[in-house]
């Protein structure tokens, strides 16, 4: 039963991703690729131009919408009278999640304004692991026994707990299914 449910959801996800691109999206991408000013547009983006605010027009730069509290806004287009108009909007599910969660709480600053990266030694700074995704990594220590002299040594590293990894994967999958 679990496998049939899993494969059913997987089938629906693949079907959704296959049907999500319309012919209009494909022609817009082909037109953009064939434009003469393609290189100049890339150079302009690389200069670090500002993002487009919510409810402002994004017809010329569909990937330049600003980020909300947590999620990035999407450029939604509406064709009216032969002319297309695009506006940066926040997805409904993102609005609900952001209103429920509120502002992202700031984490306390670790020692020396630096945190211990993933898989690095955290034996001396067990509470200073970096943040990975939504959650902060945890310092996990293991007792290692040396084969040659039989001594036990403690090996510590910043790792992501399985529960956190599963929650992040589920949220990513849900976001992919909805949006």
Curated annotation (Swiss-Prot):
Residues annotated as signal peptide: 1-20
Superkingdom of origin: Eukaryota
Subcellular location as annotated: Secreted
This protein's record includes keyword Phosphoprotein: no
Record keywords, A-Z: Amidation, Disulfide bond, Knottin, Secreted, Signal, Toxin
Residue ranges of the motif Processing quadruplet motif: 44-47
Cellular component annotations (GO), alphabetically ordered: extracellular region
Protein modification: Cleavage of the propeptide depends on the processing quadruplet motif (XXXR, with at least one of X being E).
Modification sites for Valine amide: 178
Entry's Gene Ontology molecular function annotations: toxin activity
Disulfide partners: 51-66, 58-75, 65-88, 77-86, 115-130, 122-139, 129-158, 141-156
Tissue expression: Expressed by the venom gland.
Keyword Secreted part of the UniProt annotation: yes
Record Pfam families: Toxin_35
Residue ranges listed under propeptide: 21-47
InterPro entries from the UniProt entry: Spider_toxin_CSTX_knottin, Spider_toxin_CSTX_Knottin_CS
Function comment: Spider venom toxin that exhibits cytolytic activity by forming an alpha-helix across the membrane. Lethal to insect larvae.
Family to which the UniProt record says this protein belongs: Belongs to the spider toxin CSTX family. Double-CSTX subfamily.
Domain free text: The presence of 'disulfide through disulfide knots' structurally defines this protein as a knottin. This toxin contains 2 'disulfide through disulfide knots'.
Protein name in the entry: DELTA-miturgitoxin-Cp2a
Species the sequence originates in: Cheiracanthium punctorium
């Amino acid at each position: 039963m679990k496998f049939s449910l899993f494969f059913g959801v997987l089938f629906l996800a693949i079907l959704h991703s296959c049907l999500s691109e319309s012919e209009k999206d494909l022609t817009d991408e082909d037109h953009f690729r064939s434009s003469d000013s393609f290189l100049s547009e890339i150079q302009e983006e690389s200069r670090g131009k500002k993002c487009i605010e919510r409810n402002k027009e994004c017809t010329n730069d569909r990937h330049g919408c600003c980020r909300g509290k947590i999620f990035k806004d999407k450029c939604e287009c509406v064709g009216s009278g032969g002319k297309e108009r695009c506006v940066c909007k926040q997805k409904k599910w993102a609005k609900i999640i952001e209103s429920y969660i509120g502002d992202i709480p700031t984490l306390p600053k670790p020692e020396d304004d630096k945190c211990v990266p993933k898989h690095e030694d955290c034996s001396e700074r067990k509470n200073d692991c970096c943040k990975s995704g939504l959650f902060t990594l945890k310092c996990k220590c293991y007792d290692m026994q040396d084969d040659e002299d039989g001594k036990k040594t403690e090996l510590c590293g910043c790792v992501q707990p399985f529960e956190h990894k599963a929650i992040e994967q589920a949220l990513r999958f849900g976001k992919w299914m909805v949006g």
